[in-house]
Structures are given as structure tokens and as C-alpha cells.
Amino acid sequence: MGIKNLSTRLVLALGASSAAASLVPRQTNGSSPVTSPYFQDVSDYLDSIVDELWPINKEIHDNPELGYKEVKAHKLLTDFMESHEGWNVTRSIYNISTAFVAVFEGSGDGPIVSFNAEYDALPGLGHACGHNLIATASVGGALATAEIMRAEKLPGKVILFGTPAEESLGGKVKLHEAGAFRDHNIDISLITHPTNGADTPYMITTSTDRFEVEYRGKEAHAAAGPWEGINAQDALILANNAIALMRQQTRHTDKIHGIITSAGSRINVIPALAEASFQIRSADNVALEQWTERVMKCFEAGALATGAELNLTMRPYGYDNMVNNDLLASSYAKHFTEIGGKVPSAEIDKLRDPDGSTDQGNLSHDFPSISPYFGITNENGTAPAGGPHTAAFEVAAGSRAAFDKAIMAAKGIAGVAVDVLTVDGLLEQINEEFEATKEKRRKRRSVFQISR
């Protein structure tokens, strides 16, 4: 693929947000920020391989597999990457059978840009979070970046990680704790995500933890001698009611939701066991620590009031809030709008409240990262009737229209990666911003328990 002369194809980048205004990349021809001159080639290359990517996307969507069981998707993606010249693929990395890494080496030492592919589905809902589209965008973005690297003999590396089990099981967190991303010395981490809403370079998410709650009491006949029992169900209901009342004094970004999974089986027996699963979320890690302390007191109150024994365990692999890098987001916005996309201004966009959680957030605390949203539609152009994790979204995620939008997202993140590889001083500026704005991490506890 021929690449035109750099001086004839420099394009002005989207103005950086106010938070990053002093961190624009260094220039060689004027005062405005610049992006790489190769974006048209990125776009053309992705257009040339859509007939290869569509069957991959369709196969993953039509054969949903749960986290850590994505056997078909793992084989499909690794075989596909291995079929492309220059890619070195390693399967089942870090003792995770459905994880993989694919590496494309440039002409020497240089920036290392990475993409994450997700491909797990939801129980009972299939690909209602559109992870088939995420895989497609990341695979396409990685291939396009490598093609520019090959054609221009650029230094550096392109890395595609296959990251299973995003849906509550923390695949990226597990890989990160095992050293996958640090061992490969990545400089940036890129991914995208479909939505039923607007296109945006910024994913704004919550920090979250999950808890398994168990109250143990004492059985007794509910009519003949209820005073001899200790009602575990009452303890759980008291805790739940305390949490409900506490919501009046909480920030709107502090959220908790849960289900009772068991609480007795016979109506004439005082329940000796009650179990529940709860999830708490907050805007960032610091706020989550504060919110957690308040919620734990509610669970302890249930035990204190009834005499039941409380056993509470935090599940491993909690998710951190997403820390978006403004310069990466600015690069994505520039390229996405070049191909017809529309995004809000960064100043307005970042005012959105956080919603949902992702294990990409954990990576964003340790590496400059973005996870742009791209809005998808049904085949007829209408928005899905529901958002992610609904049956309507699963249908839309399988449409050709949604696939076409994923290709646009692939072009956007590939454009970002090529900018990092080719624009003088950009990576240094990205790292300066990252160090200046990185939010305080709390120490992640693999197991957190309360027994009362």
C-alpha cells in the first residue's frame, strides 16, 4: 500500500480539551496540534477487509459463550490473526485457556500500542452487550495499525490481547495481576464499546465491588416456639431496609443493588440461613471506599438486631472507574469525525454521570487509555428498544448496521494508535497528562471478609 508524502497530508487535530490544552503534541509545521498523515490509509485498509471481518463478527454473535468458556471465539480469533502475515499468536496465556496475545513487530524499538478484544456473552441473553462488536473493532484496529507499520517500516509494536470474561468475572483484572500488560511493556490501551446512545470518545464508568452475604441463625417452629429461633431472613431484610433508608443521604453516583438468593424453604420454620448477592458502585475508588464503609454498617446492623451471625465476603476482581486520557480522546474524536461521525465537545461530554462498570477501568489506572462508545442501530436504522444487557440490544448487535459502526470505531482507534506511533512527542505528552491526572487508586483487596 502506497503512503503519500507526509508534508502533503498533515491534518489538524481536534482541539484538545481544556484539561489537556497545555499538553498538545510538539509540532514541526505550525502552532496547531497535528495527527498522523496516514488516516486515509487506515480507513482504506479497513474498508478492504470488511468481507473478512463480517464472518468473524457474525460467528461470535451467533455462538455466544460465557466468560472463560469462549472456546469457539478463542479459536476463531487466534486462527484469524495467525492467518495474517507478521503476527505472532500465543494462545491460552497466563493460565487462562481462552485468553491470547497477538504481536506484530515493527522495524525496531518504538511505542507499543495495544488493543483489547472482548468476546464473552451474558447468561440467557447472548451478546446483549455487543462483545462481538468489541472484538471486531479491536481486531480491525490492530490489523490496520500493523498495516501502516508494515508499509512505512515504522518502529514499535502492535499488540492485540484477547481478554475473556469481562462480564463480572474480571478477565482483564486477572490478566493484569498476572503481569500480562506489564510484561509486554504497553504504552497505551485501546478498546471501544457499543451503546444505544450517542457516539463519544469518553466512557465514564463507576468503580464497583460485589459481595456475597450470608446470615446464619437458628431454626425453630414458627408457631410452637418462634422465640427459640434466630431469624436469618429478618437479619437480611433489616440490612436491606437500612440500605434503602440510607439512600436518602447518598450521592446520586453512589449505587447499590442486590438480590436475595435464598431465605428459608418452609413457611412454618424460622429460617436459619439467608443469602444474598450485592453490588455497590461509586464515581471513583475513593468514593467507593467511603460508600463501602456505610453499607457494611447496614449489614452489621442486621446481625446486631437479630442475633444472627454475619458472614460477608467481597468477590475478587472488582472494577475501577475509567480514567480517560484527553489526548487519546482528542485523537479519536478527530478521526471519527473525519469519516462522518459526530461527537459532543469534551467539556460537555465529561459532565455525564458515570454508568456501568468495566474491567478496562483497572487498566486505565495504570496505562493511558480510552474506551469510546459507538451508537448502534437495528438493520432498519432504528435504535434498539433497550440498552446493553437487554434482548433488544442483542438483536441490534447482530445487525450489519451495527457491524458497519464497529468498523468506524475500528478506524478511530487505529487512527489513535498510528498517531502515537508517528507524531513526534505525542506519547511523551500523553504520559505527562496521565501522570498529572491519574486518580488515586485504593489498594485492591483480593478477599475482604466480615464475620459478626
Language-model features: locations:
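Sec/Tat-exported extracytoplasmic proteins
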Residues: 49-50, 57, 61-64, 85, ...
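Fungal secretory targeting signals
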Residues: 1-24
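Acidic/His- and Gly-rich active-site-bordering loop/insert found
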Residues: 2, 22-158
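Acidic-glycine-rich active-site phosphate/pyrophosphate-binding loop
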Residues: 106-118, 203-214, 383-390
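Histidine/acidic-residue-rich, glycine-tolerant segments that coordinate divalent metal ions
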Residues: 98-104, 120-128, 132-133, 148-271, ...
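Structural recognition of the beta-strand scaffold that forms the well-ordered cores
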Residues: 90, 112-116, 159-162, 188-191, ...
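Metal-dependent amide/peptide-bond hydrolase catalytic core
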Residues: 25-30, 34, 233, 237-452
